[in-house]
Amino acid sequence: MGFGGISLWQLLIVLAIIVLLFGTKKLRGIGGDLGGAVKGFKKAMSDEKNTDKEKPEQIQKSEESAPLDSAHTEKNKDNNKV
C-alpha cells in the first residue's frame, strides 16, 4: 500500500505517462514557474512580518507629532475669530 491505496508502481506509471504527454522541457518550465511562485509567496509573507514590526514605531511617532497638530488647529481657530 502507498499513498491512499495507490501503490508505488501505479505512481511510477502515472509519472511516466505525464512525462510522455508533456515532455521534460515543459515539465521543467512548469517546475520553475511553480518554484518562482512559492519563492514570491515566501517573500511577501516575510515582508508582511517586517511591516508588522514597523507599525508600533509609526504609532509612537504619530503620538509624538499629535501636539503639533493641536497647536496648528488652535492657530486656525484664532484666525477664524478675526
Curated annotation (Swiss-Prot):
- Which Gene Ontology cellular component annotation is one that this UniProt entry carries? TAT protein transport complex
Q: Where are the transmembrane segments?
A: 2-22
Describe its membrane topology. Single-pass membrane protein
Query: What Gene3D superfamilies would the database entry show?
Result: 1.20.5.3310
Q: What molecular function terms (GO) are annotated for this protein?
A: protein transmembrane transporter activity
Q: Which UniProt keywords apply?
A: Cell inner membrane, Cell membrane, Membrane, Protein transport, Translocation, Transmembrane, Transmembrane helix, Transport
Q: What are the recorded Gene Ontology BP terms? A: protein transport by the Tat complex
The UniProt annotation puts the region (Disordered) at: 43-82
Q: Which Pfam families match?
A: TatA_B_E
HAMAP family noted in UniProt: TatA_E
Its annotated function is as follows:
Part of the twin-arginine translocation (Tat) system that transports large folded proteins containing a characteristic twin-arginine motif in their signal peptide across membranes. TatA could form the protein-conducting channel of the Tat system.
Q: What assembly does the database describe for this protein?
A: The Tat system comprises two distinct complexes: a TatABC complex, containing multiple copies of TatA, TatB and TatC subunits, and a separate TatA complex, containing only TatA subunits. Substrates initially bind to the TatABC complex, which probably triggers association of the separate TatA complex to form the active translocon.
Q: What is this protein called?
A: Sec-independent protein translocase protein TatA
* Annotated source species: Pseudoalteromonas translucida (strain TAC 125)
